[in-house]
Amino acid sequence: MCQAARSGVFVSPDQYPAQEPFTAIGAKYHDEVLRRGRDVHGIEIAYGADPYQAITIVPSDNPNGDVFIALHGGGWTNGYKEWMLFMAPALNAQGIPFVSAGYRLAPLHVFPAGYHDVLDGVAAVHGKIAQYGGKPNRTFIGGHSAGGHLAALAALRDDWMKPRNLPADVIRGALPISGSYNVGEGSGFSMRPRFLGAPDSGAEQAASPINHIRSDAPPFFVAWGEKDFPHLCKQSEEFVAALRAAGIEAESIVLPGCNHATASYETADPHGHWVPAASRWMREH
């Protein structure tokens, strides 16, 4: 595993391999989150040979030990770890070292490639975060949209820690935002997500977090926008109910007035609904 570190790095999207063309909504989101995070700098650590296989750590000046790993959205076909850097200042102010983790994208890399990248990114954080004020046993994972899906899947599946020499409780808790928890039948998607690969791959079952709920899973703090995509609101409600039915502690928050994009922006507002609640939740767990 490659783990070369570079300090004070902001990698431009122009330095990455080409992605699928953005939708109009995606292009607007891309421009906005890069604008919001343009002054945030951190330490970049590669965990693989592909440019997308890297994490950026933004330390807190007064770390309390909690660590938050953020995974970007983009429909599994778009996005950069730099998208999430705008979240760092508000969480840093709460004493939380912030990590944004990149992963390879579809359609070139279909499931489970990007998911496995996320797991390797968690392993890199576990091995490095103590140098930056974080406690490896206080690692929380979250993300927006597709990133929320990947965070939930990593928290629920328990077949990946041992091969990476990680403790079974390496994930302290999960905080997905506007995520997808069912990518198969009944998901509400207008078309089959491209990251699943060929229709006969059977990936829907393996890739759906709701299929991996286990009674000893870590706790969840699930958020979504009041005006989010209807199928994601429904999925979020059903996911929280399923977690609770399995005996897993699950807190939820509906972000007032937020649509899919502004739910993401809300996670960087120190005086908004998400940052104070999520920071408190991490401290308590």
Identify the residue ranges that each predicted region occupies.
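N-terminal cap/lid segment of alpha/beta-hydrolase-fold proteins
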Residues: 4-62
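Mobile cap/lid helix-loop segments that gate and shape the active-site cleft of serine hydrolases
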Residues: 34, 179-212, 218
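Short beta-strand element of the alpha/beta-hydrolase
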Residues: 65-75
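Short amphipathic alpha-helix adjacent to the substrate-entry channel of hydrolases
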Residues: 80-100
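Primarily recognizes the serine-hydrolase "nucleophile elbow" in alpha/beta-hydrolase
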Residues: 120-188, 204
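Short beta-strand/loop motif that positions the catalytic acidic residue
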Residues: 216, 222-224
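C-terminal catalytic histidine-bearing segment of alpha/beta-hydrolase fold enzymes
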Residues: 223, 237-240, 244-285
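Conserved alpha/beta-hydrolase "acid-adjacent" motif
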Residues: 229-238
